[in-house]
């Protein structure tokens, strides 16, 4: 790993005037100034999260409602509460026959005396809530032995 022993050409001494050194100094300063300007520009650009679409001033909407609106909303809430009467469980004498004291207490509290299943029975209020579980046959995509080879997009399956 030695260096080649070729001769270097003789260096030429050249007289430099002071004006060229001043020019060089001035160019260096300008370069530094432009670099710092670019750096500042880059920094300011990266700090701003996003630019608004329109340059016209925007009005900021406050998240809180105006006092008048809040009052209206409270009134509406009160009306809703008044409209819904508290459900009073009607217990007839027929329901009481053959029940223990605990079951009677439970009927007074909750409105039912025993825990029965309601599967398959129609109950009022349950008409609105329903779901159907439909199982469909599985559709498979053909990956191999297809026209166009592997690089072709797969067929759409809905």
From Swiss-Prot:
Part of a tri-snRNP complex. May play a role in mRNA splicing. Belongs to the SNUT3 family. InterPro entries: SNRNP27. Keywords: mRNA processing, mRNA splicing, Nucleus. Residues 1-30, 42-62 have a biased composition (Basic residues). One of its GO terms (biological process) is mRNA processing. PANTHER family: U4/U6.U5 SMALL NUCLEAR RIBONUCLEOPROTEIN 27 KDA PROTEIN, U4_U6.U5 SMALL NUCLEAR RIBONUCLEOPROTEIN 27 KDA PROTEIN. It comes from Danio rerio (Zebrafish). Residues 31-41, 69-86 have a biased composition (Basic and acidic residues). This is U4/U6.U5 small nuclear ribonucleoprotein 27 kDa protein.
């Amino acid at each position: 790993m030695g260096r080649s022993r070729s001769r270097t050409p003789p260096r030429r001494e050249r007289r430099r005037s002071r004006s060229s050194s001043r020019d060089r100094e001035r160019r260096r300063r300008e370069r530094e100034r432009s670099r710092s300007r670019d750096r500042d520009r880059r920094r300011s650009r990266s700090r701003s999260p996003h630019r608004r679409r329109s340059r016209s001033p925007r009005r900021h909407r406050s998240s809180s409602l105006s006092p008048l609106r809040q009052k209206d909303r409270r009134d509406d809430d009160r009306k809703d509460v008044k409209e819904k009467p508290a459900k009073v469980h009607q217990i007839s004498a027929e329901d009481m026959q053959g029940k223990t004291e605990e079951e009677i207490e439970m009927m007074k509290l909750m409105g039912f005396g025993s825990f029965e299943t309601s599967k398959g029975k129609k109950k009022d209020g349950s008409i609105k809530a329903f779901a159907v579980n439909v199982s469909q046959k599985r559709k498979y995509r053909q990956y191999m032995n297809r026209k166009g080879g592997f690089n072709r997009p797969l067929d759409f399956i809905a």
